[in-house]
Structures are given as structure tokens and as C-alpha cells.
């Protein structure tokens, strides 16, 4: 569109030059084209918008934009606003106006109409441009919001671990039963969590747009001290000690949000917002420009919530004065001490004060010597309230916090990025009013800080990237609920001095929750180790050294000092050294402030940090400690992470004492605001002489003086705690009663000061205590106050490192110790790694120097082969050998069986050949005799008699045979049954009626074969007869029978062939009867089977010869029966099963011997010979279908196989059943 219009415009311009007369027509044409294009675009947009309902209704509607408006804007922006077009439009319009002046009515109307259209379109486009500007603003705002949300999401993702830790802490605290303060804290927090939406009404912060998610709610609870219910003014300082112990922890916990922010800039971890914690910012400081608008809110908030959290509102003016003085002297540290002294609870009691303390602690951690805050407060300490008004009197904690911030940047990603690069000028900012010091004017608020207003607060505390965000760590909650904070409110919350005091308690709690009443086990030695290993790597902890050594550290200290004591300390960092000395003096004034005193710790730590700020800044990046003492950022992260930061700071100072200042060991009771012995009443009057040394003067002025007097922080520490004051009796448990910031550990090195000399034995004891991190007093957020309950440690570290099992000893909640040990372990590993690398390199060098031949030999050598592979190969070879051997044995077995079968077949063939030859001869003779007999018809009668005689003779022979067999076998019964059956075929061969299924008790050959069936069920396993025995016994018997049949059938030559066939069949069928007999013999008298078989064979041979002779003699007599025999032999029909059964029964019954005896014999003898006889009765290993064999023989083989199969099955079944039965009995018996 634009191109077309510009092309038309250029063409019109060219045409105008030669002839101006063409101006109006050309202008008319171009403008009309322009308007037509615009109208077409609007129409197209309207048409398309019908299909874009979702886009317009759900998205564009947010910005009050329509598709048509969007297109009009595009036309106006791209086409109508085109410079070339705009430059020519006036001329074109003038041409059109000229056209209206023509006298041609038609032309005038045309031009006038076009002119009106153009003017309307121009006005519409102008409105579109204006409307679009508004829409663009909305769109930009939406884009910014989305970008902010994404950035926040990214930050929240980074803070996820911190959130989980915090939630775990919250759960532990919820389940933790401590003093009423603890319960109040739990109830308050539960209420806050349950009613997150109402959190904007938080009395501790003005911010009303907090995120309602669980993480942010918890963060807000921790940050604003909501966990601690507002303390009423009527609560007195004397109540503070108990409350302080837990309150400081909670406050410190609240501080942790900033610490957590170190890990991730999540809102939950963001530092306390000034609005949230106006107390933290002195009124004057609160107004500090560095805090931006929040600064303005801070003063009002502090004033507004003075009742609830009166930092300076102490019932006793002396307490206030002392606290203010302490704060002034400590430049916040003094206040912290005073507050703690007045009531460790006071500092922790008022959320604001504790927060202020936290900030103060942060400032100290930033590296500002606690003394600096003290000095600053001392300046403003003349009146606690003056401190509020005075920039110099910003809560020492807050200025200290600012200073701390300088070294200990907020751990959020934004601050962390800037922390390392914090310029010295930012440090010098300490010269500015304390409130502004932390918020280095040079450091503008990072644009991303507003993402976590509930963490960073409206006032971007992050402006001072060094301002360490209080770490909400599990240890932050170890102290009882904010009851301490509640108690604290009675303290003059209004006075910024008190705020610093509160800060001191809470900050110390943050830094030393374990050390201050919660972690008696936390030792300066541990802190030193942490400090040295992580941050310093330098065991010389001379604070003076640190301050002068590190420019940045000096800057930090200087600003802090100047901030705390603008009068005493000039803004420039050069003042830092004096400030340090002043701080030391103040410490002396404080008289042995507990090394755990957060401010003191910070003073020293700040000194160290100042000296090592740069190095620490680097380490702090790694260590997420935003602890004031750890502000150095070396291992600050550790301290931030754990409420033990204060202990760690204290340890740092203790470490300083140990390393460089053995002579000075702060020994202030944890309950004291500065770590001095907590007094039941924070009021100076309440302080005992012993405690007085710790808080020589609760009044701020004394502290400034003392601070100035103190030559050095070490010296101060020496005299710091000449007489450690025991925690107030009100504190039942050091961890509970004493404010977290107060070191309640009797072994606390801070308390170990003997005439200013550090006691190495005590140090050793502390070391051991540290080693044994399992301490009920350790500051921990574990749900269980009693570590001896046997429950597994549920701290985040054990959860992370998998130490979930129940500990052998009480589980330690001393997170600072844990971190220290972990860091030490890490450093050791790092130190060992270079050695390992060197060793590895040496090894590699040795290998590299080896010759290629050696390497190849080594690679190819058999020794190089892994044992597993050789074993596997050996197993494979062994398996292969087994398989080969098995195959070989199987082949040999097959060969033997094959040979055996061949031999048997040969023997059978030979026997059959002999029998056939004999039969042929007999047949020939009989044939001749028959021919002769035919001629002699007259002999028929004689023939009839002869057959009867023959039958009688055969019967006699059978009887003789039976008698013989019976004599051979001891069991006549068995022999009767078997021999009768075997003999019956012979006798029955003469009587065709037997074969005709006559009901004779003697079964025929076929019947006999079937007759074994009844025997099978009795003992199928014994039905199998040895093949050889069958061959020996059956074949002779069959031969005899065949001979009988052949004699009868020898009528004609034609019958010879049939007789030969039938002889084979009977020879095979009769084998069955012997088989059955053998079957019976086997069960009844198996041992005698072999001799019987031999005897039977002999008998059969004899009978055969006798029969042959008889048949030869009686051929003529048997001729008449040939036909009948022929029929019987040719078609022998097996008797019906009933007949077989009857036959079998009759045979057995006919035997004279009783059955019982036979059975007994069968059992006895069968057991002995069954194994040897089984091999004999096995069937032949041949293919019955493929081998050419007689039907009878095939049937016998089939029967053998049937018996074998059934026997096997029966055996298997029987054995299994019996075994199972016995096992079942055993199991039942067992049950």
C-alpha cells in the first residue's frame, strides 16, 4: 500500500513539474487513492476481526485495543506519517482546494467532497494516534509486568531451596514445644500462613502487595517478625530475657530472608524492608535517601509502631540511656549490647528492634566494627530518641547492617552480582548517615530489586549490595517465639538506639543464633575455622589488620563507623581505623562483650572483613553468608544460611581471640544484648556488677567513651568479659531463654575471659563442644527441643546429605558447626585434590615413559586378562567338555543298545530258522504220513482214540512240567498260575474249543497275552519281563505250541505255507502267556525267576522233543483234527476280557498255594531282584513301524513299552505322593 502510494506520489510529482495545470487532478487522484487505501484497510480489518474474537476479547481487550484500531494505527504510523507523504500532503491539499475554486460545479463538488473526506480521515488518524499512545502505555506496562514476573519466577526458582529449608524450619518450629513465647510465635505464624491474603495489614510493614504464595508468606513472616505477636508496652524488660532468647532467633530468622536472598533473590530471603522494619532504620537513617521512598516510610513506621516494637521505649530511663549509649558506643553494636543487656529479649522482642539488630548485625557483618555503630549511637545516644532523629544515631544495628551490607551483599542474584564489585566509595558511604550508609548513594537501587518488595522492601536495601540480607535459616527459629520481641517492645523502640539494640539481639541471633543462647556448642574456634578456611584462610584475625589491610574493608568500616559515629568518625574510610579503635574502646566499655555479641563480632569481623573484604567478597560470593561478621562474604553464606551466623561471627571473633588475641576472649553472657550476660532485667539497675562489666554503662555515652578508650577490639575482648554474667535465671534453657543473639553457651569462648586472657583449655573445651555438635542448646530449628528423643535429624543438611538415620548421639542443630565442618571438609578435599592430581600426573608420566613394546606386551600378556574372563572361559570349556562327554556317553549307549538289539534279533532269527527247519521237516514227515493215513481210511476210529490219547499225554506232560517248575520254585502257587498259563497254550492247541472262546478255565495264547491285564494293575512295574528271558522261555513254548498246531495242520502242502505263517504268529502270541507267567513270577518270586527261566527252557525243550516224538507217532491220529487246528491257528480270537479275567482267576484259584504266601514271596523276592530284572524286561529300542517283524512280536513290544511307561508313571507318582505326604506331616507337626 505504502509503495503504491509513494509510487503514485512520485509519478504525480514528476507530472507536476512540467504542467502545473495537472496539479488538482493529480492531487485529487492521489488523495482519493490514499483514502481508498485507508478505507479498504479498515474494511478488511473489520472483516477479519470477526474471526479474531478470541484475540480481541481475551488479549487485546486488556489494552483497549481492537483489530481495526491496530490496523488504523499501522496505517497512520507507517503510511500517513511517512515523511515523504507528509511533506507533499499540504501541497496536494492546496491543489484540491484550488480545484474547489473552479467554476465547474461538478468539479467543485468532487474536490470539495474529497477535501472533506480527507479532513475527516486526517482527524480520525490523529485520534487513532492519540488513542494508540494510551494503548501503548498499557501494553508497555503489561510487558514490563510480564518481564518482572518472569524475572521473579527465575529468582524464585533460585530460591526454591531456601523456601524448602524455611518451610522445614517452620514445620519444626510448629511442632516444637517451648516457652509461651514459642507458642505465641507458632500461633502467630500459623495465623499468618492461614490468612495470607490479609497479610497486607501486617503491622510491621507497609507493603500491601505481597505475594500470597506460601513461600513469600513465610518469607514475610520471617522478615517482618509476624511470627512474634506484637508485644504490648506493658511488657517489661525483665520479661525480656526469656523472650529474647527465642525472639532473637526469630528475628534473626526474619533477617534470614535477606540471607536466603543471597542464595536466590527470592522475596522470602530478601532483606527486611525498611517499611517492614522501620525500626531497623533509624528515624534519621530511615529517611536516608538511600532507602528511597522506604526511607520516608521508615521513620513513620518506627514512630507508628513504636508502641508495638518500642526499640527505645524502655520503662527504665537508665536502661534506655544505657542502651542508647551502648548503641552509640557500639555504633549500633553498643545499642545491640545495651538492648541485649537490658533484655536480650528486647532486641529480639521487638520485631523492629530485632530487625534493626539484624540490620545492625548485618552492618557489622558488613565489616563495620560493632564499635563503629556504638560510636555512632554514642553520638546520638545522648537521647535514645535523639538517635532516632540523629543520623548518627541510626540503630547501630542498622548502620552496622549497612556496613555489613557493604561486605555482605544481599545474597539475591542482583545484589550478589554487584557485591563483589562494591566500590570503596560505597564503603565510604558509611560516612553518610547510618541510615544511608548501607544504602550506598552511589549504588542506585537495582531495577530488579522491586521484584521482591516483600523481601527487599519498598526501600531497595539492595542499593547497598553489601547489606547482607538476614538469612532465614532453620537456626533462626531456635529461640522461643517472638515473645522476646514482644518483651523487647517495652524497650524504647522509638529510639533508634534501641533499634540498633534490637538489631543487635536479632542480628546476633541471626549470626549467632546457636552461639547466642541457642548454640552453646558453637565455638569461636569453629567460627575461626570457618572464617579462616572459607573467608580468611588467614589465622591472624587482628581486626586492626583487617581494617587497614582491606581498602574495601576500611571503606565498609569507615562508613559504618562514620554512620554510627559521624562525629567521632569522619565519613572517609580513613576513619575506619580510628573507628575500629573506638569500637575496641567501646568494647572495653562494654567490658568483655561476648564474642558472640553480634556487634562486637562484627566490629572484629568487620575489621577482619575490612582487611579481607576484597578476598571475602570473592569468598562471600561462594559462601552465601550475609552474616554481619561474615559480611566479609567469605563464609557469610554459611552464617546466613543458618541462624548461627551470629555464632559464626562470634566464633570469628573468638577465633580472632584465639588466633591473634588469646589474651582477649569476650565472655559476655549470651543473654546480654551484645552477648554480655543477659540480665533478668535489662535495666542498668538490674545489671549485677558482673553484668555491669559486660555493659559497663547501659547508657550510650559510657560506651562511646569506653570504646574510644579501648586500644583494640582484642583488648576490649580481653577485658570484655572478665566476669561472665550467667544468663538470667528466667532463662530455663540457654537456647530458649537467651535471645538467639545472646550467647547462652557457658562454654562460649566469648564468655571465657580470664582477666582478658583467653583460656586455651576453655578453647579446647569449646572445640570439643563444637566437635560434639549434638547439643540441646545448639541453636536449631528442629521440631524437637530435646535432641535426646532419639529422633533422626531432620535438619536441611542431614536431609540433603542423606543422614536420615537415627543418630548414635543426640543430633546437633548447630548449623554453623555443620557448615564449618562441611567447609573444612571441602577445603581438605580441595587441598588433597592437588596432591592426587600430582600423583596421577606422576603415574601418567611413568606410564607415558614406558616403551611401546612394553605396553603392547602388557596389553597382550595373559596376566592382563581379567580374572572374570578367564573364569568364564574356564567354565565354558568345562561346560563344553561336559556336553561332549555327555554326547559321547549317549552315543556309546546308543551303540551298545543297537548292538544288543542286533544280537537279540540275530538270536531270534537263528532260533526261528531252526524252528522253521524243524517244523518243515516235521511237516514233510507228517505230510507223508497223512498221505499214508488217507489211504488207510479204516483207521479213522483209531485216529479218534489217538487224539484223545495224545491229549491225555499232553496233559500229563503239562502236569509234569508244572510239577517240575513248582519244584524248582518255592512258591508253587506262582508256578501253578504261570505254568498253567504257559502250558495251556500247548494243551489248548489240541482243543480248538479253547481258541473258539469256549468257557474253559484255560486261556488261549491270545487270551493269555491279554490275561496279563488283570495282573498289570496289581504290579505294573513288575509286568515287564526281561527280553532275554522272554525269548528263552516264550520261544521254546511257542515252538512247542507251533509244533502242535503244525502237526494238526499238516493235511496238505498248501497248508505248509500257512502253517509256517501261523507258526510264526503262534510263536509270537504264545510269548504273551509266558510273559504273563513271568509277570506273575516276578512279583511273587523274582529271585527265582532266573533259575525258573532256565528250568522252563529246559522243560520246554524236553517237552518239545517229547511232543515231536508223540506227534510223529500219532500223526495218523491227529489228521482228523488238522482242520480244526487250522481254523484255531489261522483265526485265533482273543477271549473277551471277562473270560480273560475268569481264566486268570481260575488259574490262580486252581493253584493249591494260598495267595497271601505268594504275595509275601513276591514282595520279598521282588525287592531283591527287581533292579537286575528290569534291564531284562525292557522293550527293544527299535522303530516297530519301520522294522519288519511279526505281528505277535510287535504286539509284545508294544505291551512291553506300555508296561514300561505305566511303570515309570506309577513309580514317579508313588514316590512323589509319598514324599509330599511325609512333608505335609512334617509341616503340620511344625505348625
UniProtKB/Swiss-Prot annotation:
A UniProt-annotated Pfam family: FAM193_C
Residues carrying Phosphoserine: 293, 648, 1136, 1151
Key word Phosphoprotein present: yes
Keywords: Coiled coil, Phosphoprotein
Coiled coil feature spans: 106-142, 877-973
Recorded family membership: Belongs to the FAM193 family.
Name assigned to this protein: Protein FAM193A
Biased composition (Basic residues): 872-881, 937-946, 1156-1166
Segments of skewed composition (Polar residues): 962-979
Organism this protein belongs to: Mus musculus
Region annotation (Disordered) ranges: 249-272, 331-405, 633-703, 719-789, 826-845, 860-1174
Listed Basic and acidic residues bias regions: 882-909, 921-935
UniProt biased composition (Acidic residues): 355-365, 761-773, 910-920
Residue intervals passing through the bilayer: none
Lineage: superkingdom: Eukaryota
Bias kind Low complexity: ranges: 258-270, 676-691, 776-785
Amino acid at each position: 500500500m505504502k509503495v503504491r502510494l509513494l509510487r503514485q506520489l512520485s509519478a504525480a510529482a514528476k507530472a507536476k513539474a512540467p504542467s502545473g495545470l495537472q496539479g488538482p487532478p493529480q492531487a485529487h487522484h492521489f488523495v482519493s487513492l490514499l483514502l481508498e487505501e485507508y478505507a479498504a484497510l479498515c474494511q478488511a480489518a473489520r472483516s477479519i476481526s470477526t474471526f479474531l474474537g478470541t484475540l480481541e476479547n481475551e488479549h487485546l481487550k486488556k489494552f483497549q485495543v481492537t483489530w481495526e484500531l491496530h490496523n488504523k494505527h499501522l496505517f497512520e504510523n507507517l503510511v500517513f506519517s511517512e515523511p515523504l507523504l507528509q511533506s507533499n500532503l499540504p501541497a496536494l491539499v492546496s491543489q484540491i482546494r484550488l480545484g474547489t475554486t473552479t467554476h465547474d460545479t461538478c468539479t467543485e463538488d468532487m474536490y470539495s467532497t474529497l477535501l472533506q473526506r480527507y479532513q475527516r480521515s486526517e482527524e480520525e488518524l490523529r485520534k487513532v494516534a492519540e488513542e494508540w499512545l494510551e494503548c501503548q502505555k498499557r501494553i508497555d506496562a503489561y510487558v514490563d509486568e510480564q518481564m518482572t514476573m518472569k524475572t521473579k519466577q527465575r529468582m524464585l526458582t533460585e530460591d526454591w531451596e531456601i523456601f524448602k529449608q524455611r518451610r522445614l524450619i517452620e514445620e519444626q518450629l510448629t511442632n516444637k514445644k517451648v516457652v509461651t513465647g514459642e507458642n505465641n510465635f507458632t500461633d502467630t505464624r500459623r495465623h499468618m500462613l492461614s490468612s495470607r491474603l490479609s497479610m497486607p495489614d501486617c503491622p510491621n510493614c507497609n507493603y500491601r502487595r505481597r505475594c500470597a504464595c506460601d513461600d513469600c508468606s513465610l518469607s514475610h513472616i520471617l522478615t517482618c517478625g509476624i511470627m512474634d505477636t506484637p508485644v504490648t508496652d506493658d511488657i517489661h524488660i525483665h520479661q525480656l530475657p526469656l523472650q529474647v532468647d527465642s525472639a532473637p532467633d526469630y528475628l534473626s530468622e526474619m533477617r534470614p530472608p535477606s540471607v536466603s536472598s543471597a542464595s536466590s533473590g527470592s522475596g522470602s530471603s530478601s532483606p527486611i524492608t525498611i517499611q517492614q522494619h522501620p525500626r531497623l532504620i533509624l528515624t534519621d537513617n530511615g529517611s536516608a535517601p538511600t532507602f528511597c521512598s522506604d526511607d520516608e516510610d521508615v521513620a513513620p513506621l518506627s514512630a507508628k509502631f513504636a508502641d508495638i516494637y518500642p526499640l527505645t521505649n524502655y520503662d527504665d530511663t537508665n536502661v534506655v540511656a544505657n542502651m542508647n549509649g551502648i548503641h552509640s558506643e557500639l555504633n549500633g553494636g553498643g545499642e545491640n549490647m545495651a538492648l541485649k543487656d537490658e533484655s536480650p529479649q528486647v532486641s529480639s522482642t521487638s520485631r523492629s528492634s530485632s530487625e534493626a539488630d539484624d540490620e545492625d548485625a548485618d552492618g557489622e557483618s558488613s565489616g563495620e566494627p560493632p564499635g563503629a555503630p556504638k560510636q555512632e549511637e554514642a553520638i546520638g545516644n545522648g537521647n535514645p530518641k535523639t538517635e532516632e532523629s540523629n543520623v548518627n544515631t541510626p540503630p547501630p544495628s542498622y548502620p552496622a547492617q549497612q556496613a555489613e551490607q557493604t561486605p555482605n551483599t544481599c545474597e539475591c542474584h542482583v545484589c550478589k552480582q554487584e557485591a563483589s564489585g562494591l566500590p570503596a566509595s560505597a564503603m565510604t558511604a558509611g560516612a553518610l548517615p547510618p541510615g544511608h550508609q548501607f544504602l550506598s548513594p552511589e549504588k542506585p537501587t537495582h531495577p530488579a530489586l522491586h521484584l521482591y518488595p516483600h523481601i527487599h522492601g519498598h526501600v531497595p536495601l539492595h542499593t547497598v549490595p553489601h547489606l547482607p540480607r538476614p538469612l532465614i535459616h532453620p537456626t533462626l527459629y531456635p529461640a522461643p517465639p517472638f515473645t522476646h520481641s514482644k518483651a523487647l517492645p517495652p524497650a524504647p523502640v522509638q529510639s533508634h538506639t534501641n533499634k540498633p539494640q534490637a538489631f543487635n539481639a536479632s542480628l546476633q541471633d541471626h549470626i549467632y543464633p546457636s552461639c547466642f543462647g541457642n548454640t552453646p556448642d558453637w565455638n569461636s574456634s569453629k567460627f575461626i575455622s570457618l572464617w579462616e578456611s572459607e573467608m580468611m584462610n588467614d589465622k591472624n584475625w587482628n581486626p586492626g589488620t583487617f581494617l587497614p589491610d582491606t581498602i574495601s574493608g576500611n571503606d565498609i568500616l569507615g562508613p559504618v563507623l562514620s554512620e554510627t559515629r559521624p562525629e567521632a568518625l569522619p565519613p572517609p574510610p580513613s576513619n575506619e581505623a580510628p573507628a575500629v579503635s573506638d569500637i575496641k574502646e567501646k568494647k572495653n566499655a562494654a567490658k568483655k562483650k561476648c564474642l558472640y555479641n553480634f556487634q562486637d563480632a562484627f566490629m572484629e569481623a568487620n575489621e577482619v572483613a575490612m582487611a579481607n573484604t576484597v578476598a571475602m567478597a570473592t569468598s562471600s560470593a561462594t559462601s552465601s553468608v550475609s552474616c554481619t561478621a561474615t559480611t566479609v562474604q567469605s563464609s557469610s553464606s554459611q552464617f546466613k544460611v543458618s541462624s548461627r551466623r551470629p555464632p559464626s561471627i562470634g566464633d570469628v571473633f573468638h577465633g580472632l581471640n584465639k588466633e591473634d588475641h588469646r589474651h582477649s576472649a569476650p565472655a559476655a553472657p549470651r543473654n546480654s544484648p551484645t552477648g554480655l550476660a543477659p540480665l533478668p532485667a535489662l535495666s542498668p539497675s538490674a545489671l549485677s556488677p558482673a553484668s555491669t562489666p559486660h555493659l559497663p554503662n547501659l547508657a550510650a555515652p559510657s560506651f562511646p567513651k569506653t570504646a574510644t578508650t579501648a586500644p583494640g577490639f582484642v583488648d576490649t575482648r580481653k577485658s570484655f568479659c572478665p566476669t561472665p554474667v550467667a544468663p538470667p535465671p528466667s532463662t530455663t534453657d540457654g537456647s530458649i531463654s537467651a535471645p538467639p543473639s545472646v550467647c547462652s553457651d557457658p562454654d562460649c569462648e566469648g564468655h571465657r575471659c580470664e582477666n582478658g586472657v583467653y583460656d586455651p583449655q576453655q578453647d579446647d573445651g569449646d572445640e570439643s563442644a563444637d566437635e560434639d555438635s549434638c547439643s540441646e542448646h545448639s541453636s536449631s530449628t528442629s521440631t524437637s527441643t530435646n535432641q535426646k528423643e532419639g529422633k533422626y535429624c531432620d535438619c536441611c543438611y542431614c536431609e540433603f546429605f542423606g543422614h536420615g538415620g537415627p543418630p548414635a548421639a543426640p543430633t546437633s542443630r548447630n548449623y554453623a558447626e555443620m557448615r564449618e565442618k562441611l567447609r573444612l571438609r571441602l577445603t581438605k578435599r580441595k587441598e588433597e585434590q592437588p596432591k592426587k592430581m600430582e600423583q596421577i600426573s606422576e603415574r601418567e608420566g611413568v606410564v607415558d615413559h614406558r616403551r611401546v613394546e612394553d605396553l603392547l606386551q602388557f596389553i597382550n600378556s595373559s596376566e592382563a586378562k581379567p580374572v572374570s574372563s578367564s573364569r568364564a572361559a574356564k567354565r565354558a570349556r568345562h561346560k563344553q567338555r561336559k556336553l561332549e562327554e555327555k554326547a559321547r556317553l549317549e552315543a556309546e549307549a546308543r551303540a551298545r543298545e543297537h548292538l544288543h538289539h542286533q544280537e537279540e534279533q540275530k538270536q531270534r532269527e537263528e532260533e526261528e530258522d531252526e524252528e522253521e527247519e524243524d517244523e518243515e521237516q516235521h511237516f514233510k514227515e507228517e505230510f507223508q504220513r497223512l498221505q499214508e493215513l488217507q489211504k488207510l481210511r479204516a483207521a479213522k476210529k483209531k485216529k479218534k482214540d489217538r487224539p484223545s490219547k495224545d491229549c491225555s499225554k499232553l496233559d500229563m506232560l503239562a502236569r509234569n512240567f508244572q510239577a517240575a517248575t513248582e519244584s524248582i520254585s518255592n512258591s508253587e502257587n506262582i508256578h501253578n498260575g504261570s505254568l498253567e498259563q504257559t502250558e495251556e497254550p500247548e494243551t489248548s492247541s489240541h482243543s480248538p474249543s479253547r481258541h473258539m472262546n469256549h468257557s474253559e478255565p484255560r486261556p488261549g495264547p491270545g487270551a493269555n497275552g491279554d490275561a496279563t491285564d488283570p495282573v498289570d494293575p496289581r504290579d505294573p512295574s513288575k509286568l515287564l519281563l526281561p527280553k532275554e528271558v522272554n525269548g528263552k522261555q516264550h520261544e521254546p513254548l511257542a515252538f512247542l505250541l507251533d509244533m502242535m498246531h503244525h502237526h494238526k495242520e499238516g493235511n496238505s502242502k498248501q497248508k505248509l505255507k500257512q502253517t509256517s505263517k501261523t507258526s510264526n504268529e503262534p510263536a509270537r502270541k504264545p510269548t504273551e502267556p509266558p510273559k504273563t507267567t513271568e509277570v506273575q513270577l516276578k512279583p511273587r518270586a523274582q529271585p527265582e525267576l532266573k533259575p525258573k527261566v532256565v528250568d522252563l527252557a529246559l522243560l520246554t525243550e524236553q517237552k518239545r522233543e517229547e511232543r515231536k516224538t508223540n506227534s510223529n507217532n500219532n500223526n495218523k491220529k491227529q489228521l482228523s483234527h488238522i482242520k480244526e487246528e487250522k481254523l484255531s491257528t489261522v483265526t485265533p480270537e482273543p477271549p473277551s476280557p471277562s473270560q480273560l479275567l475268569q481264566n486268570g482267576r481260575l488259574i490262580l484259584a486252581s493253584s493249591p498255594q494260598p495267595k497271601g504266601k505268594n504275595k509275601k514271596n513276591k514282595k520279598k523276592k521282588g525287592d531283591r531282584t527287581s533292579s537286575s530284572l528290569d534291564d531284562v524286561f525292557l522293550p527293544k529300542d527299535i522303530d516297530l513301524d519301520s522294522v519288519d517283524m511279526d505281528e505277535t512280536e510287535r504286539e509284545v513290544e508294544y505291551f512291553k513299552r506300555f508296561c514300561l511307561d505305566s511303570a515309570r508313571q506309577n513309580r514317579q507318582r508313588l514316590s512323589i505322593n509319598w514324599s509330599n505326604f511325609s512333608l505335609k506331616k512334617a509341616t503340620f507337626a511344625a505348625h
